[in-house]
């Protein structure tokens, strides 16, 4: 597949400068083969060591597609069904006993969970706090049983992004296989796909080199300061993946091209609309977002964000093209940059506006006299309250 390498590298280098990014790795695959890979900037500020395509980064929520894949593999092995009630697999979670939440609802974030304060109470192996309550999936069950909260909607009715839902999927996986989540991922994903520079959590970091340190902008806004990885075992199934852009590209290529990789159905099945965006071409499947473009093209993708980490992985099935990005600072615009890379390869095949990110807002979507009904106080146990006014 033809592309202008000089133009692509100008795009990536420009992003480094524009968004004050310390280090960035990128990889593009076509038909499962690498056609572009590179690194820009620093992976370690104290040693001035540079990023390359084999540098390992935390990729946060991109972990979710791995967790979803294992659940679908388990369904193919006939040891669960995604239509099973979650309460059948986690009977000790009392808040689920009167609900009809199924595994498929956890996969596409439609279980109805509100924002919960779980991450503020979870054990960080690098930064233990006195009020830490949760290290394991079983600890999560105990915590949720004590927490007073109301569900947002009936299962399947509303997308409400929930890390806790993916923690519960991790709990189900460990109970199904009677093994740690780390062991199951290694046996069912890393080893079969030969993802040789991927692992879960930081406990295996000592066996690898070339790991990017997470950074944040210093007080003077001119320098970068190292921070610790957030290493919370409870969230391993929601965001614990450490990997390279090469391994990420290979993973999404297998999922996208084969469609299942030993799973019962593609991860794009069981989708629900993302109603926070202003048209119906955006949806969420099982650990993947799904964008309907034009000419019957479909982009499957996900991002990851947490302190010191920004990532993107995407796959365009019709062109068998994958893009992976990793950055060692939070809040980098990886979704926008990932789409801009796709544009360089697609040329005139897809209307550029279809790959725009964030999506273009339709100013006529709401009449001015409708806006008042959205004012008021909003909030959650996870993020606190905020006021919306005209």
PLM-predicted stretches and their roles:
Residues 39-41, 228, 311, 327:
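Short clusters of small/polar residues that mark proteolytic maturation junctions
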């Amino acid at each position: 597949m033809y592309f202008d390498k000089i133009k692509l590298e100008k795009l990536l280098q420009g992003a480094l400068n524009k968004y004050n990014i310390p280090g960035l790795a990128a990889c593009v695959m076509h038909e499962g083969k690498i056609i572009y890979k590179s690194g820009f900037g620093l992976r370690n500020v104290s040693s001035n060591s540079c990023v390359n395509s084999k540098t390992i980064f935390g990729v946060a929520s991109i972990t979710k597609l791995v967790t979803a894949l294992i659940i679908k593999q388990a369904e193919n092995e006939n040891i669960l069904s995604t239509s099973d009630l979650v309460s059948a697999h986690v009977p000790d979670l009392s808040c689920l006993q009167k609900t009809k939440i199924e595994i498929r609802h956890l996969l596409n974030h439609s279980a109805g969970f509100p924002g919960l304060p779980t991450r503020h109470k979870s054990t960080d192996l690098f930064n233990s706090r006195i009020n830490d309550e949760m290290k394991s999936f079983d600890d999560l069950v105990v915590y949720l049983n004590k927490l007073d909260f109301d569900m947002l909607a009936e299962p399947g009715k509303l997308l409400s992004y929930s890390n806790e839902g993916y923690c519960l999927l991790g709990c189900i996986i460990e109970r199904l296989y009677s093994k740690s989540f780390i062991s199951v991922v290694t046996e069912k994903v890393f080893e079969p796909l030969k993802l040789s520079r991927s692992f879960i959590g930081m406990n295996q970091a000592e066996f690898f080199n070339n790991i990017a340190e997470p950074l944040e902008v210093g007080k003077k806004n001119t320098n970068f300061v190292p921070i610790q990885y957030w290493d919370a075992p409870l969230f391993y199934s929601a965001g614990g993946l450490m990997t390279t852009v090469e391994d990420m590209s290979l993973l999404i290529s297998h999922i996208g091209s084969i469609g299942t990789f030993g799973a019962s159905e593609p991860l794009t099945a069981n989708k629900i609309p993302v109603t926070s965006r202003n048209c119906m071409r955006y949806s969420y499947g099982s650990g993947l977002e799904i964008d309907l473009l034009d000419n019957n093209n479909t982009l499957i993708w996900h991002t990851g964000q947490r302190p010191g980490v920004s990532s993107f992985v995407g796959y365009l099935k019709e062109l068998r093209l994958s893009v992976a990005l990793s950055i060692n600072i939070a809040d980098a615009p990886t979704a926008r940059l990932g789409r801009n890379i796709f544009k360089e390869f697609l040329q005139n095949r897809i209307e550029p506006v279809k790959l725009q990110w964030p999506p273009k807002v339709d100013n006529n979507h709401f009449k001015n006299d409708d806006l008042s009904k959205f004012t008021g106080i909003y909030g959650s146990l996870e993020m606190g309250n905020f006021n919306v006014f005209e």
